[in-house]
Amino acid sequence: MARPKIALIGAGQIGGTLAHLAAIKELGDVVLFDIAEGTPQGKALDIAQSGPSEGFDAVMKGANSYEEIAGADVCIVTAGVPRKPGMSRDDLIGINLKVMKSVGEGIKAHAPNAFVICITNPLDAMVWALQQFSGLPAEKVVGMAGVLDSARFRHFLSVEFNVSMRDVTAFVLGGHGDTMVPLVRYSTVAGIPLPDLVQMGWTTQEKLDQIVQRTRDGGAEIVGLLKTGSAFYAPATSAIEMAEAYLKDQKRLLPCAAYVDGAFGLNGMYVGVPTIIGAGGIEKIVDIKLNDDEQAMFDKSVNAVKGLVEACKGIDSSLA
């Protein structure tokens, strides 16, 4: 039985990290694609040469032609321009929309049956555009957002409570940007909701509010520290978690930027919501109930995403 084929579109920091993680976890053979000649080939060769020490047999290949991604089971898209200090994710829309058009056409022509995970920012608008350009079924095109944002939230909570990250669950919904909605009420430590932990004296509401805001600013904090790029380790591990759920039919409940039509009162748009990922792609949207405050924050985030989608339509008339 042939191993699954994983195509990584973009051989930058995230793409290279994705390739390494996919190999270590033996998720399948990897094609690392980039328009820059030599870059994907060099990284693929470097990672392949770590195989004897790390004990994996996955085949690594670098490519500059979309023909090399033919028949891919999973495509993870990182291609585009990363943020720099002072930039918001939304500042990237014009440049990266053109990239999504090229990528979408490449996937449509050579890997139309793939499960596609988009990482390129501004995430919610780019995954929508990628689905439009590729023509793939909406349940097979998803954005990596909530898994990363929730991981950041979980990390900050584990540090605050001095407990293992394995015992912290957290949900972040909405757009992957400044209006994201970390759901305190649905987040727990070993099953104990965060509001109860405040009442128990484990932390204060003020500290919890600070953690929520730091989660929203999580990407910008790293951009400010690196100065020359954006995060890549955590985004890559988040996307690999999603890819593994699909390839192994794990039925994982993961927050992702998915196409929502009916749930949460939304009609046909991409935004971060709880999903079930299995062999069918996005197999279910988990329509959790929000209180008035949560709904107001979610609505604000949805409106921000709608604004980005309208901006995309203004830039490329084929999307209108």
UniProtKB/Swiss-Prot annotation:
Keywords: NAD, Oxidoreductase, Tricarboxylic acid cycle. GO terms for biological process: lactate metabolic process; tricarboxylic acid cycle. Pfam families: Ldh_1_C, Ldh_1_N. It is an enzyme of class 1 (oxidoreductase). GO terms for molecular function: L-lactate dehydrogenase activity; L-malate dehydrogenase (NAD+) activity. The active site is at H176 (proton acceptor). Its EC number is 1.1.1.37. It comes from the Bacteria. NAD(+) binds at G10, A11, G12, Q13, I14, G15, D34, N96, I119, T120, N121. Substrate binds at R83, R89, N121, R152. It catalyses: (S)-malate + NAD(+) = oxaloacetate + NADH + H(+). NCBIfam families: MalateDH_bact, PRK06223.1. Catalyzes the reversible oxidation of malate to oxaloacetate. PANTHER family: L-2-HYDROXYCARBOXYLATE DEHYDROGENASE (NAD(P)(+)), L-LACTATE DEHYDROGENASE. Belongs to the LDH/MDH superfamily. MDH type 3 family. This is Malate dehydrogenase. It comes from Cereibacter sphaeroides (strain ATCC 17023 / DSM 158 / JCM 6121 / CCUG 31486 / LMG 2827 / NBRC 12203 / NCIMB 8253 / ATH 2.4.1.). The lineage of its organism: Bacteria, Pseudomonadati, Pseudomonadota, Alphaproteobacteria, Rhodobacterales.
